[in-house]
Amino acid sequence: MQPEPKLSGAPRSSQFLPLWSKCPEGAGDAVMYASTECKAEVTPSQDGNRTFSYTLEDHTKQAFGVMNELRLSQQLCDVTLQVKYEDIPAAQFMAHKVVLASSSPVFKAMFTNGLREQGMEVVSIEGIHPKVMERLIEFAYTASISVGEKCVLHVMNGAVMYQIDSVVRACSDFLVQQLDPSNAIGIANFAEQIGCTELHQRAREYIYMHFGEVAKQEEFFNLSHCQLATLISRDDLNVRCESEVFHACIDWVKYDCPQRRFYVQALLRAVRCHALTPRFLQTQLQKCEILQADARCKDYLVQIFQELTLHKPTQAVPCRAPKVGRLIYTAGGYFRQSLSYLEAYNPSNGSWLRLADLQVPRSGLAGCVVGGLLYAVGGRNNSPDGNTDSSALDCYNPMTNQWSPCASMSVPRNRIGVGVIDGHIYAVGGSHGCIHHSSVERYEPERDEWHLVAPMLTRRIGVGVAVLNRLLYAVGGFDGTNRLNSAECYYPERNEWRMITPMNTIRSGAGVCVLHNCIYAAGGYDGQDQLNSVERYDVETETWTFVAPMRHHRSALGITVHQGKIYVLGGYDGHTFLDSVECYDPDSDTWSEVTRMTSGRSGVGVAVTMEPCRKQIDQQNCTC
């Protein structure tokens, strides 16, 4: 017998026998045989150690495509699902167990864990619509599914039942896109029932953010009293004022008054009633029939009315803080000349946004927020062409990134202080040329009108202003002759000012704010030096005490409170216009420098409100 030849170099296909072949001609009957070993020796290279790898990228898709064709032609199927749902006639679907098990942990357990279905050719399925099961089976073979609004809840429920997580996520994402004031509560309830945590959270967040619109829908009026109380207790409810929550509760009770009037008191205790204005409470006590019919509720609101009008310190109630970014806004300022900048600082990531400029450059202005809108009040335009004191009031809307002019004050006010009580802006002191004002005027946004109120007991420019317990405090300043350490308090019900305990230090151009039921006065100018000292006024003990000093000396600084901490921005240290921003933590009594402004400046207007609409910013910054 001839020895088999040893081959070298590239093999020729004719020299290899196929795995299955017919016997050579003349070798007897033609039968199929298997070649059990390779008869050829191949040495592609000198050492013979080279290897290669090959992957057919779309093999899985092709293989599942073939299996789907087998399913549709009912070939090699090893299970029939008999699906029964309520009164709908049962439907049968033939499939391959291995494919179903590969897409669903429920089917995998059913067909592999020794359950009785493992050996069954016909398996009964209940609790899922046949059309839903048909789509899920098709998804198992094709990795594709098409779902419309009318059936998405059924498909998602079926996907949850059979733990097909990818379909659950797809349905959840679709439903999030469909969220609307009219369906958000229903979607949230559905997600809770099927245990879809992510969809439930997204729907609830939508409800919190759009509470005013949701509260007008039919779904809202179908909430139970417990569900409503839980909803309105949320700190992150997005409302412009607490009266929205109050009216929503009263409307819910009116929807079925005979059955719901018993829940009024419980609901009112969930409303932040101390955030309501005395005028609003007085109107409701006089005109709301539901309150007049419930003596306990009426007494409860009367007590709150008295506490507000008597300016009693109340137990701290968390402010509504919607989960929308809240930024620190800085408007205007001075560096060589007055600036028109509007910028916003995000303490959570340290970023700055450049926004729509003021229509006229201003420094020595004040900033405040009412109903989410930022107001820039007074100031002066210092320019190479001359100096002009301003009586202007401009309103910035973060949703449109636009400024709108409002009614002007009765007189120009440079180096002004402002505070907000009951949604009204109080403009305090300031100067017009060589005139130093003691006058104070109040702006009502609903009417776009200013009205003079009682003047301060002392003329003050560079005055620090803050509001605590519905009282307006004017702190320090300059009267035209002397820098001041005196402070006074305005009682709106009496329309009168009273002196309070003076500060330990003379301060003009200090930053003044309220934190944790105390008034803070930071920095300023004492007639000789810019200051870095900080003192705090306790309204209950009527005493001023020093706290930790700032890192930098500064006067004409901006100041505000964000998430329980004090921020001071810019100012003048006697030599330089500062760009530094410091943050005070009352828990540790420490200051830290957290960022720098885009440029040094003093005399900025500062306030905190919602993050601006990015879409509007991008459109207005577009250069195309």
UniProtKB/Swiss-Prot annotation:
<feature type="repeat" description="Kelch 5">
    <location>
        <begin position="519"/>
        <end position="564"/>
    </location>
</feature>
<dbReference type="GO" id="GO:0006511">
    <property type="term" value="P:ubiquitin-dependent protein catabolic process"/>
</dbReference>
<feature type="cross-link" description="N5-[4-(S-L-cysteinyl)-5-methyl-1H-imidazol-2-yl]-L-ornithine (Cys-Arg) (interchain with R-135 in KEAP1)">
    <location>
        <position position="151"/>
    </location>
</feature>
<feature type="site" description="Sensor for electrophilic agents">
    <location>
        <position position="288"/>
    </location>
</feature>
<feature type="modified residue" description="S-(2,3-dicarboxypropyl)cysteine; alternate">
    <location>
        <position position="288"/>
    </location>
</feature>
<dbReference type="GO" id="GO:0032991">
    <property type="term" value="C:protein-containing complex"/>
</dbReference>
<feature type="modified residue" description="S-(2-succinyl)cysteine">
    <location>
        <position position="241"/>
    </location>
</feature>
<feature type="modified residue" description="S-(2-succinyl)cysteine; alternate">
    <location>
        <position position="151"/>
    </location>
</feature>
<dbReference type="GO" id="GO:0034599">
    <property type="term" value="P:cellular response to oxidative stress"/>
</dbReference>
<dbReference type="GO" id="GO:0034451">
    <property type="term" value="C:centriolar satellite"/>
</dbReference>
<feature type="domain" description="BTB">
    <location>
        <begin position="77"/>
        <end position="149"/>
    </location>
</feature>
<feature type="cross-link" description="N5-[4-(S-L-cysteinyl)-5-methyl-1H-imidazol-2-yl]-L-ornithine (Arg-Cys) (interchain with C-151 in KEAP1)">
    <location>
        <position position="135"/>
    </location>
</feature>
<dbReference type="GO" id="GO:0030496">
    <property type="term" value="C:midbody"/>
</dbReference>
<feature type="modified residue" description="S-cGMP-cysteine">
    <location>
        <position position="434"/>
    </location>
</feature>
<dbReference type="InterPro" id="IPR017096">
    <property type="entry name" value="BTB-kelch_protein"/>
</dbReference>
<dbReference type="InterPro" id="IPR011333">
    <property type="entry name" value="SKP1/BTB/POZ_sf"/>
</dbReference>
<dbReference type="Pfam" id="PF00651">
    <property type="entry name" value="BTB"/>
</dbReference>
<keyword id="KW-0539">Nucleus</keyword>
<feature type="modified residue" description="S-(2,3-dicarboxypropyl)cysteine">
    <location>
        <position position="273"/>
    </location>
</feature>
<dbReference type="GO" id="GO:0031463">
    <property type="term" value="C:Cul3-RING ubiquitin ligase complex"/>
</dbReference>
<feature type="modified residue" description="S-(2-succinyl)cysteine">
    <location>
        <position position="613"/>
    </location>
</feature>
<feature type="domain" description="BACK">
    <location>
        <begin position="184"/>
        <end position="286"/>
    </location>
</feature>
<feature type="repeat" description="Kelch 2">
    <location>
        <begin position="373"/>
        <end position="423"/>
    </location>
</feature>
<feature type="modified residue" description="S-(2-succinyl)cysteine; alternate">
    <location>
        <position position="288"/>
    </location>
</feature>
<dbReference type="GO" id="GO:0061629">
    <property type="term" value="F:RNA polymerase II-specific DNA-binding transcription factor binding"/>
</dbReference>
<dbReference type="InterPro" id="IPR000210">
    <property type="entry name" value="BTB/POZ_dom"/>
</dbReference>
<dbReference type="GO" id="GO:0005654">
    <property type="term" value="C:nucleoplasm"/>
</dbReference>
<dbReference type="GO" id="GO:0005783">
    <property type="term" value="C:endoplasmic reticulum"/>
</dbReference>
<dbReference type="GO" id="GO:0005884">
    <property type="term" value="C:actin filament"/>
</dbReference>
<dbReference type="GO" id="GO:0005829">
    <property type="term" value="C:cytosol"/>
</dbReference>
<dbReference type="GO" id="GO:0097718">
    <property type="term" value="F:disordered domain specific binding"/>
</dbReference>
<dbReference type="GO" id="GO:0071353">
    <property type="term" value="P:cellular response to interleukin-4"/>
</dbReference>
<keyword id="KW-0880">Kelch repeat</keyword>
<dbReference type="GO" id="GO:0005737">
    <property type="term" value="C:cytoplasm"/>
</dbReference>
<feature type="repeat" description="Kelch 4">
    <location>
        <begin position="471"/>
        <end position="517"/>
    </location>
</feature>
<dbReference type="InterPro" id="IPR047098">
    <property type="entry name" value="KEAP1_BACK"/>
</dbReference>
<feature type="repeat" description="Kelch 1">
    <location>
        <begin position="327"/>
        <end position="372"/>
    </location>
</feature>
<dbReference type="GO" id="GO:0016567">
    <property type="term" value="P:protein ubiquitination"/>
</dbReference>
<dbReference type="GO" id="GO:0016234">
    <property type="term" value="C:inclusion body"/>
</dbReference>
<dbReference type="GO" id="GO:0001701">
    <property type="term" value="P:in utero embryonic development"/>
</dbReference>
<dbReference type="GO" id="GO:1902883">
    <property type="term" value="P:negative regulation of response to oxidative stress"/>
</dbReference>
<feature type="site" description="Sensor for electrophilic agents">
    <location>
        <position position="151"/>
    </location>
</feature>
